[in-house]
A protein has these predicted regions:
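Long, charged/polar, surface-exposed segments that mediate recognition or autoinhibition
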Residues: 99, 107-137
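Structural motif
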Residues: 66-71, 116-122, 175-185
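Mid-chain, structured segments of secreted extracytoplasmic proteins
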Residues: 80-111
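Acidic, small-residue rich beta-repeat scaffolds with periodic aromatic anchors
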Residues: 2-10, 28-30, 34-44, 131-132, ...
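Terminal domain-start segments
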Residues: 2-92, 208-222
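Acidic/hydrophobic-patterned starts of short beta strands in beta-sheet-rich repeat architectures
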Residues: 52-61, 100-112, 161-169
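Short loop/turn segments that connect beta-strands within beta-propeller blades
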Residues: 76-77, 127, 188
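Short consensus segments that form the blades of beta-propeller domains
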Residues: 36, 62-63, 112-115, 173-176
């Protein structure tokens, strides 16, 4: 199966350092305080057309241990699953159903870790036999951030292409100006390949290039 499309990402000098700011530690609870409730291990579900055949599959995510989750589905009678990891300190969200390249087959945007103001996601795809992680140009699992609070402006969006397909853009910036690079990739069989890198300098945060809209990446009909 070929998974093709154009992916556009943006990387920003200094954003990683901004995200490294320590969160304020809450005051210690008194000795008489009730202990925190255990995190739920109940499964969460969504629906997606993983192979683009018009049939809808139920996708389930469930915490299975310390910093581990399993994401699973059944496609044409075959059970498939993957363990992409998770932040077991917070409740688990159901995967977001996306179609990053507009080919009709779903990618799953899965939460990996949650900070005070920033959530980090990875992406999964169905290769015709099992679920796998979308990887970057270095064959490492894709990581996408959203949020950033006062330290950064982070997110992603998709834009339709003339003639079909989609552009997938990830955005990262400080809250005043946007400086860094925009990198154009193709997506094939769950792997990103860099095609072009475009430098960007001193864009204001109100510039449309910084617009983010996760819903614009949703799979049509999901």
């Amino acid at each position: 199966m070929n998974h093709t499309g154009i992916i556009r990402t943006a990387t920003i000098t200094g954003v990683a350092a901004a995200l490294g700011l320590a969160a304020v530690v809450p005051a210690l609870a008194s000795p008489l305080s009730d202990p925190p409730a255990a995190r739920s291990t109940d499964p969460v579900t969504t629906v997606a057309d993983l192979d683009g055949d018009g049939e809808i599959e139920t996708v389930t995510a469930q915490l299975t241990g310390e910093n581990d989750q399993v994401v699973s589905a059944t496609v044409h009678g075959t059970f498939i699953s993957i363990h992409p990891g998770a932040d077991s300190a917070v409740p688990l969200d159901a995967p977001r159903v996306a179609d990053l390249d507009g080919d009709g087959r779903a990618e799953l945007i899965v939460t990996r870790s949650v900070g005070a103001n920033t959530t980090f996601f990875t992406a999964l795809h169905y290769d015709g036999r099992n679920l796998g992680q979308v990887v970057d140009n270095d064959s490492k699992p894709l990581s996408v951030a959203e949020g950033g609070g006062v330290a950064a402006h982070l997110g992603y969006r998709c834009t339709p292409l003339d003639g079909g397909g989609r552009i997938f853009e990830t955005v990262g910036a400080d809250p005043i100006t946007y400086s860094g690079t925009r990198t154009v990739h193709t997506l094939r069989d769950g792997a990103l390949t860099t095609r072009k890198t475009i430098p960007i300098t001193a864009r204001p945060v109100t510039d449309p290039v910084l617009g983010t809209d996760a819903a614009s990446c949703a799979q049509t009909g999901s």
